[in-house]
């Protein structure tokens, strides 16, 4: 088979069994979709395209930072299914639009080859229910898991080698291509991944790499970038004279 990824009733992507072996509990860090909206004359609103996390909240370390549990989410969601489609309606009284997700994998009767394409389509639909103009932007974030070998004590993925992210574009689709390097192509988790869209190039902004800092710097940088204007800067640039805090040092000195 081609493995599978599960879509939870909150709108969350979970159970990533795509590494040529069972992985019922596999989680993909920093992998989610977000929406930004701004009504004429109003304040910008941003949400992760999931409903709020559910209890019990009983893990000894709480949520790991790669789960971005502190980012704002929708009040509730409703899932309905009609094979091969899954539909999720997101609900929040503060949101001036109706938002839903239609997700499916290729299913073509009498065509086993194309029905087995290892990919999924996620179509987010937004309807303006007001009389005002509303600007909308949707962003997707997905971790490069090529070479996945398990998790460390803090739920971060371990990899067989290095990873590379590259923006690619052609006449049909454009997006981020995920590959690996410096390990054997015979490794059980060797391969590639992609996060792509059919949107026109002129409407796309991208951030192929997250900011490499300490603790939650990468997630905070992404969210501040996106929630400000609904667009992504290609790179994060910070001027920190006399300080290595945003690098990989454990201490900062002035």
What are these regions (language model features)?
Residues 2, 134-136, 254:
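Short Pro-Gly-centered flexible turn/kink motifs
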Residues 28, 81-83, 92-94, 169-171, ...:
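A generic structural signal for short, non-catalytic loop/turn and secondary-structure boundary residues
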Residues 1-55:
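Beta-strand-rich N-terminal accessory domains
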Residues 43-44, 96-98, 133:
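Short, mixed charged/polar active-site loops
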Residues 23-26, 74-81, 164-168:
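Short linear motifs in intrinsically disordered
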Residues 101, 106-231:
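Polysaccharide-binding surfaces and accessory modules of carbohydrate-active proteins
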Residues 30-39, 53-63, 86-88, 174-176:
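Short polybasic amphipathic segments
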Residues 55-119, 214-253:
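Extended, loop-rich substrate-binding clefts of extracytoplasmic carbohydrate-active enzymes
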């Amino acid at each position: 088979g081609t493995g599978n990824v599960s879509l939870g009733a909150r709108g969350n992507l979970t159970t990533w069994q795509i590494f040529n072996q069972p992985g019922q509990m596999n989680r993909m860090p920093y992998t989610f979709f977000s929406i930004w909206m701004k009504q004429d004359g109003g304040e910008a609103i941003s949400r992760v395209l999931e409903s709020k996390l559910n209890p019990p909240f009983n893990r000894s370390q709480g949520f790991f930072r790669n789960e971005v549990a502190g980012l704002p989410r929708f009040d509730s969601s409703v899932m309905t299914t009609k094979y091969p489609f899954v539909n999720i309606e997101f609900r929040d009284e503060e949101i001036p639009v109706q938002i839903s997700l239609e997700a499916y994998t290729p299913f073509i009767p009498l065509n086993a080859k194309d029905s087995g394409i290892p990919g999924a389509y996620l179509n987010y639909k937004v309807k303006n229910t007001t009389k005002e103009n509303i600007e909308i932007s949707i962003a997707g974030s997905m971790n490069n898991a090529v070479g996945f070998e398990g998790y460390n004590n803090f739920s971060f993925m371990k990899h067989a080698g290095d990873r590379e992210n590259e923006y690619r574009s052609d006449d049909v689709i454009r997006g981020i291509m995920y590959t690996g390097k410096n390990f054997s192509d015979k490794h059980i988790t060797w391969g590639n991944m992609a996060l792509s869209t059919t949107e026109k190039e002129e409407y796309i902004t991208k951030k192929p790499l997250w900011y490499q800092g300490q603790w939650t710097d990468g997630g905070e940088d992404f969210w501040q970038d996106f929630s400000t204007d609904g667009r992504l800067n290609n790179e994060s640039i910070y001027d920190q004279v006399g300080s290595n805090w945003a690098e990989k040092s454990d201490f900062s000195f002035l």
